[in-house]
């Protein structure tokens, strides 16, 4: 993604990034400071990719009549653990997409990966480390560790979210109205976030001597 050379940071974290005191996303997250400027992500993750998942027209009745806006849902990620989901509305499609991209950047998080399938013992971070479930509205998505080489066994929307997070192999189980792209994407994103909720023992993944 292109970085805005004229950006003047307003937050403490933004100033630390420009000064070079925070040089990576890992350092930014560990600092405990909130990420409130999308330009921070542009600097720390220059290889970030974005993809529009859904554009929908929404209407609202007001005293002055019916108002129409476009709602855009966007996923961003570097295909190596960092992923974010965002949505925004605007009277035009272009601005709605740009706002959604900025929102996705501010929601970016690191997803822990591993080799959690009993059928595989490669030790590479190609799938989720254990089974997790995410929910959004009526949609429920369960991610199950898969052996290396299987690929992503999921619907189109979930596949886009998982690919941006760097997940290469995974089984999925879905329930509810998966035709709703927004809830399907949110449920998949929530499932990925559940990976970080579980606390693992310090010896997890280490061979016993």
Curated annotation (Swiss-Prot):
What are the protein's GO molecular function terms? rRNA binding; structural constituent of ribosome
Q: Domain named S5 DRBM: which ranges?
A: 48-111
GO cellular component, alphabetical, reads: cytosolic small ribosomal subunit
The record's annotation in PROSITE patterns points to: RIBOSOMAL_S5 (PS00585), S5_DSRBD (PS50881)
Gene3D superfamilies attached here?
Answer: 3.30.160.20, 3.30.230.10
Free-text note regarding domains = The N-terminal domain interacts with the head of the 30S subunit; the C-terminal domain interacts with the body and contacts protein S4. The interaction surface between S4 and S5 is involved in control of translational fidelity.
Name of the molecule in the record: Small ribosomal subunit protein uS5
Q: Which organism is it from?
A: Methanosarcina acetivorans (strain ATCC 35395 / DSM 2834 / JCM 12185 / C2A)
User: What gene does the UniProt entry assign to this protein?
Assistant: rps5
């Amino acid at each position: 993604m292109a970085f805005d050379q004229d950006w003047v940071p307003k937050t403490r974290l933004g100033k630390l990034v420009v000064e070079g005191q925070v040089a990576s996303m890992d350092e930014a997250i560990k600092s405990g400071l909130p990420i409130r400027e999308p330009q921070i992500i542009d600097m720390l993750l220059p290889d970030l990719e974005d993809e529009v998942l859904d554009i929908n027209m929404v209407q609202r009745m007001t005293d002055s009549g019916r108002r129409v806006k476009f709602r855009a849902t966007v996923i961003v990620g570097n295909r190596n653990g960092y992923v974010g989901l965002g949505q925004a509305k605007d009277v035009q499609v272009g601005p709605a997409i740009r706002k959604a991209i900025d929102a996705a950047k501010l929601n970016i998080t690191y997803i822990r990966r591993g080799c959690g399938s009993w059928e595989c013992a490669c030790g590479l971070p190609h799938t989720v480390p254990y089974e997790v479930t995410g929910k959004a509205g009526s949609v429920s998505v369960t991610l199950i560790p898969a052996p290396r080489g299987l690929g992503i066994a999921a619907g189109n929307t979930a596949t886009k979210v998982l690919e941006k997070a760097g997940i290469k192999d995974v089984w999925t189980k879905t329930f509810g109205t998966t035709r709703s792209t927004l809830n399907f994407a949110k449920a998949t994103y929530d499932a990925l976030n559940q990976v970080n909720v579980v606390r693992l023992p310090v010896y997890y993944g280490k061979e016993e001597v």
